[in-house]
UniProtKB/Swiss-Prot annotation:
Tissues where the protein occurs: Expressed in pollen grains.
Highest taxon listed in the record's lineage: Eukaryota
Effect ascribed to mutating residue 510 to D: Increased pollen tube growth
InterPro entries given in the database record: PRONE_dom, RopGEF
Protein name: Rop guanine nucleotide exchange factor 12
Organism annotation: Arabidopsis thaliana
The keyword Cell division is annotated on this UniProt entry: no
Entry function: Guanine-nucleotide exchange factor (GEF) that acts as an activator of Rop (Rho of plants) GTPases by promoting the exchange of GDP for GTP. May be recruited by PRK2 at the plasma membrane to maintain polar Rop activity in the pollen tube and control polarized pollen tube growth.
GO CC term, one of those recorded: cytoplasm
Residues of the PRONE domain: 83-446
Amino acid sequence: MVRASEQEQETYRSRLFNFKWRNNDNNSATRHNKSLSVETGLDEAATGSHDAEPLTIIHPSQGPPLSRSAADEAVLAALAASQARERQLLADMEQMKERFSKLLLGEDNSGGGKGVSSALALSNAITNLAASVFGEQRRLEPMPAERRARWRKEIDWLLSVTDYVVEFAPSQQKNKDGTNMEIMTTRQRTDLHMNIPALKKLDAMLIDCLENFKDQSEFSYISKDSPDLDGKRNDEKWWIPTVKVPPDGLSEASRRFLQYQKDCVNQVLKAAMAINAQVLFEMEIPESYIDSLPKNGRASLGDQMYKNITVDFFDPDQFLSSMDMSSEHKIVDLKNRIEASIIIWKRKMVYKDNKSSAPWASGVSLEKREVFEERAETILLILKQRYPGISQSSLDISKIQFNEDVGQAVLESYSRILESLAYTVLSRIDDVLEADRAGNKRNTPLEAEEETLVGSMTLSDFMGWDFDQAANAELESKKDLPDDPLIKEKLSVVTTKKTSYLETLGGVKSPTARH
C-alpha cells in the first residue's frame, strides 16, 4: 500500500515537472508537446488509465491533423518515390557507363586495340540512337513520352563530349596591383559553340511539330492488314500505313495547318542540310579516296557525260534531263562521278606535280577546268536539293569513316539524323496532302493545269534561262518584219547569240568561291 502511494506521488511529480518544462521552453514547442504527449500516455498506461485519446501528429502546414495511419502512408509514399528515383539514377549510371565504355573501346569489346577511332565511334553511337528512337516514326503523331525522354537523355550524354572540346583564346586578367595582363584561357571550340545550340533548336522544333498533331482527328491511318484497305496500295511504300481522309477531303483549316507545318519542317531540313554540307566540306579528303580516283575527269564521268558538261552553252537542267535517274542507285552513281571529277579538277588546278606534264593534261587550260568544276558543283547542288533523302556518296562515307576530329563527327552525325528526321516528317505530311488531293475532285481542269505548270517549272525557268521563250519570241517577231534582207541579217546576228551559263549566273558564286 505504501509502495503504491509512493509510486503515485512520483508519477504526479513527473507529470508536474513536464508541464512546467513545456511552459518555460517556448522555442521548441512542437518537440516538447510530442514528448509530453508520449510521457503522459505512458504514465496513464502505468496507472491503469485507458481513457486517454489516441496519439496525433500535427502537420507543419495548416490543415487538419493527420492520424497515425495517414501520416505513415505519406511517409511511405515519399520514401517509395525517393527509392524509385535512386533506382532510376543507378540504372542511368549503369547505362551511361556502358555507353561510354563502348566509346572508349572503339566498339571492340575484346579490348585488343582493333577498334575504330573515337570520332567514328561517337558518330556511330549517335546514328544508332536515332535509328532506334525514330525508326518507328511512320505516322504524324506525337512521340511516346518514354521514347522522347530516352532520346533527350541519351543525346545529351553524347553531346556532353563537345563541352570539353576547347580552344585557346586570349583574355585579360587584372592583377592585385591593378595592372592588366594578357593570358590564354580555354573556351568551347567556335564551330561547336555556334552549331550545337542551333542543332538542339532544330531538334526541339521537329519534336514540337510532331506534338502539334496530338489533337487532330480529321485523318487517320489504316494498317496493311485492315479490311478497309483498298487494292490501290503503293508497293514502293508498303511498310508505311495508308492515310485515310474524310470523303469530302480535309477542311480548309486542316490544309492550312498542314501547309504551315510543312513549311516549318522544310526550313528545319534546309538548315540541317546546310550545317551538314558545311561540316562535310571542312573534313579532310582521305588519301585512300584520292588514290582510288581515275587520272582525269573524262575517265570519271565517261565520254558522253563529259561532253555534256564541257559544251559551250551549258544548261544544268537540260544535263540532268538527259541522265537516267530512274532509281536511287543511279542517282548515287551520278553523284559519285560528279564528286570525283570535282576533286580531280581541283587537284589539277592547285597541285603542280609531275603528273601535270602528262600528254592528256595539256589539252585543257586552267580557265576551262575551273569552268567545268563550277558546272559540276552546280549539278551536285541541284541533286542534293532535289533528292535530300538520297544515300550518301562515296566521298561522304570516306570522309566520315576516316575522320579523326571528334567535334566534326558530332556535328556531322547530329545534323545528318536531323536532316533524315525532317525528311521523314516532310514525307508523312506529303502523304496526307496527297491522300486529300486523291480523295476529292474539287480541282477544276484549269486549276489542275495551273498546278501542272507550276510543278513542271524547270531550273532554267527559275534562273531566267528562257531559251525556248526567246526562240518563240524571235519567230513571232520575224513574222511582222519587212522583207528587207539587211534587217533580217542584223536580227539573226543579235538573236542567235545565247548567253553562256556563267554570264547568266551573274553574282551567284560557286561553292569554292565562298570558302
